[in-house]
Amino acid sequence: MGPFLAIVGDTWRQSRQQVVFLLLIGAMALFSVAWVLLCRVQVTPDGTYVLTLAVGGSAESGFEIDWDNQYKETLSGEQARDRLRGPERERRQAFERMERAAERLLLARAREAAPEVKQPLEAELAAAKEDFEGKDRALQALVKEVDDAAQRAVDARSPGVSALEKGVQVWMSTGVMILVWITMFGFIAACAGYFPAMLAAGAVDVLVSKPIRRIEIFLGKYVGGLVLFTAALAAAFGVMFLGLGFRTGVWHLQFFAAMPVIVFSAALLYALVAWIGIYTRSTALAVIVGYVYYVILEWFVWGLQVLDQVLARGGVEYRWVTVLSEGSRWAFPGFGRLRIAAQAAVLDVPVFDAQPLVVGTAWLLLLLATGYLWFRRLDF
């Protein structure tokens, strides 16, 4: 255990010498303090305490007005994703059968086929159209049912939460969303140099010359960076929690439920940039791949899923969009959905989306295993 902790400590010392990591710590600290100071408690004419912006905010436009919408949209979105997938697929299949029937009928008419040939095709098209319209009505009814169920959940939960508590939860949830972007962007750049710096000539020679197993070196470097990130994140959460608690009197412990989701996202990104750093020994390439993976790929996957849903509910069907959407959903971890999960945890919305956790865990284990195997094979 001693050598492992020594590697962890060495990673911490390396971080203190990195300008990027220090900038990340500074940005997290500045944001945490600013987020506390940017809000204030006001009293409405009827004596209700609400949370508003510190500058330009009025008691009539408190943050609590967004609580119902955020809670409902998060709840209905997660439920719709699970309950509508099957009916949407059935509707899509019915649409494809209707299209094929229409094509066969058009072809028969173009060839001026005999009536006894066209009549069965017309009957087939009519049946396919009726089937599609039935499945479409069933889907629309299910969409309304999901929306109504989410509204009932909001109506049941809302009376037990004061306006001020709602405002604090919304403010915390929004802060988590922004903090995720700040920390992920900064951490990619900060951790990208850990392994390339260790593998540089001289540094790694000293390590492997000591009685330290390579698995201890590898995990020590990885865990060291991740623990340091977690400590900085915990400090930021602590500042926001204490600051908002003292300013508002609302101590929302559920706020900390977002932390494990953020740490998991950071662990996954760190595993990727570490993998690139081990294979290429290039900090710059690790940073570039990390940003491409987190930003460009994430927006591409999210865009495909939104496009597929919009087309499906609008009555337009493109098979290739559906295939790409479903394939990308299970091929890549959904950082956007993890971010939504973190916000849902703050609002205490009773939803759990296992897909990004399952896919992300698979990626994490694969990257760490293959990265370590390559690191073990390196000849120093």
Listing of model-derived features with the role each one plays in the protein:
Residues 376-380:
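Short cytosolic juxtamembrane segments of multi-pass membrane proteins
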Residues 12-27:
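Membrane-interface helix starts
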Residues 203-207:
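Short cytoplasmic-facing helical segments at TM-TM junctions of multi-pass membrane proteins
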Residues 1-6:
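Short, membrane-interfacial amphipathic segments enriched in basic
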Residues 7-11:
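Amphipathic alpha-helical interaction/coupling elements
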Residues 39-64, 68-116, 123, 129-130, ...:
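Terminal transmembrane helical anchor/hairpin motif
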Residues 26, 30-47, 54-63, 68, ...:
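Secretory targeting signals
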